[in-house]
C-alpha cells in the first residue's frame, strides 16, 4: 500500500478540486441566470436610448457560448467524479501498476484543470458583463 499513498493523496486532492469545481458551476449558473435577466432589461434600455448595440452582441455571444457548453461541463463534472471514485477503488484493489496509475491520474488532473479553467472563464465574463450593464444604466 505504501506505493499507492502518493496516488491516494492525489486522488484526495482531485476530489477536493472537483468539489470546488461543482461550487464554481453553481456560481456560473447563478451568474448566467442573473445575466439573462439583466440582458432583457439592458436590451430595452439600449433600445429606448438609441445606444449602439455591439455590447449586446458581445453579451449575447457569452450567454450563447455558455448555453452551448453548460450541459457538456455538467456531464464532464459527473464523469470526472465517477472516474476518480472508480480509480480510487481500483487502486485500493491493486488493479494498476505505477505507470497506469500515473497515466490515469494525469488524465484526470488535466480534465479537472480544463473544467476549472472553463468555469473561471465564464464566471469572469459574466461578472464583467454584469458590471458593464450596471455602469451603462447609471449613465
Each model region followed by its residue ranges:
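Generic preference for well-ordered secondary structure
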Residues: 2, 19, 23-26, 50, ...
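Structured domain cores in non-transmembrane regions
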Residues: 40-80
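Extracytoplasmic electrostatic interaction patches
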Residues: 68-139
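Immediate post-signal-peptide N-terminus of mature secreted/exported proteins
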Residues: 3-56
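Generic low-polarity alpha-helical segments
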Residues: 1-3, 39, 127, 139
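Primarily heptad-repeat coiled-coil rod domains in cytosolic scaffolding/tethering proteins
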Residues: 6-9, 13-16, 54-57, 61, ...
Amino acid at each position: 500500500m505504501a506505493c499507492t499513498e502518493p496516488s491516494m493523496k492525489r486522488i484526495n486532492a482531485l476530489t477536493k478540486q472537483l468539489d470546488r469545481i461543482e461550487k464554481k458551476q453553481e456560481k456560473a449558473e447563478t451568474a448566467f441566470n442573473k445575466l439573462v435577466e439583466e440582458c432583457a432589461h439592458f436590451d430595452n434600455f439600449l433600445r429606448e436610448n438609441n445606444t449602439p448595440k455591439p455590447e449586446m452582441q458581445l453579451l449575447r455571444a457569452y450567454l450563447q457560448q455558455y448555453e452551448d457548453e453548460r450541459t457538456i461541463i455538467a456531464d464532464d463534472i459527473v464523469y470526472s467524479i465517477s472516474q476518480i471514485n472508480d480509480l480510487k477503488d481500483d487502486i485500493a484493489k491493486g488493479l494498476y501498476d505505477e505507470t497506469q496509475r500515473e497515466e490515469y491520474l494525469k488524465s484526470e488532473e488535466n480534465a479537472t484543470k480544463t473544467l476549472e479553467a472553463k468555469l473561471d472563464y465564464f464566471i469572469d465574463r459574466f461578472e464583467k458583463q454584469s458590471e458593464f450593464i450596471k455602469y451603462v444604466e447609471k449613465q
